[in-house]
């Protein structure tokens, strides 16, 4: 890619401890409450991750596992297996039972410009959507995992 591409960065503050948020990101039973339909997550660096969605699946490898403050993994879409990116999630204890969730989706600069032009905005909107669902789950609000933007 000829030009530098910014990372996708999304941040949200939630009313839960870092331990609870970390579990919702790393335990399959927690993940399926707000994000994929089914999940495999091996809780260790080098572990497998597989997320099943109505539109396809994502696979990857856990690259960072630091309970309860950070998790990272590679992100490989089933429809574009040759285009891996990386997702890193950092959790900051804000006190009073609140946690800041910062997600950074990187690796776009190594991908073809047409792929980035099409899929980076979708991922940006998708992460914003699903982080809101994480907050909805934590707050006890209904969680509607419907996500039409990736149904291409």
What are these regions (language model features)?
Residues 43-48:
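Short coil-to-beta transition motif at edge beta-strands of beta-rich domains
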Residues 3, 107-152:
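A conserved amphipathic terminal alpha-helix motif
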């Amino acid at each position: 890619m000829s030009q530098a591409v910014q990372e996708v960065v999304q941040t949200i503050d939630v009313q839960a401890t870092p331990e609870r948020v970390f579990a919702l990101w790393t335990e399959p039973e927690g993940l399926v409450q707000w994000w994929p339909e089914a999940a495999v997550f091996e809780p260790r660096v080098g572990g497998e991750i597989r997320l099943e969605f109505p539109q396809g699946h994502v696979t990857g490898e856990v690259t960072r596992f630091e309970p309860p403050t950070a998790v990272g993994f590679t992100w490989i879409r089933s429809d574009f297996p040759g285009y891996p990116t990386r997702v890193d999630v950092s959790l900051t204890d804000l006190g009073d039972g609140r946690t800041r969730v910062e997600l950074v989706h990187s690796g776009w600069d190594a991908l073809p410009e047409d792929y980035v032009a099409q899929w980076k905005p979708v991922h940006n909107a998708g992460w914003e959507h699903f982080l809101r669902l994480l907050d909805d789950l934590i707050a006890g609000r209904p969680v509607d995992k419907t996500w039409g933007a990736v149904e291409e």
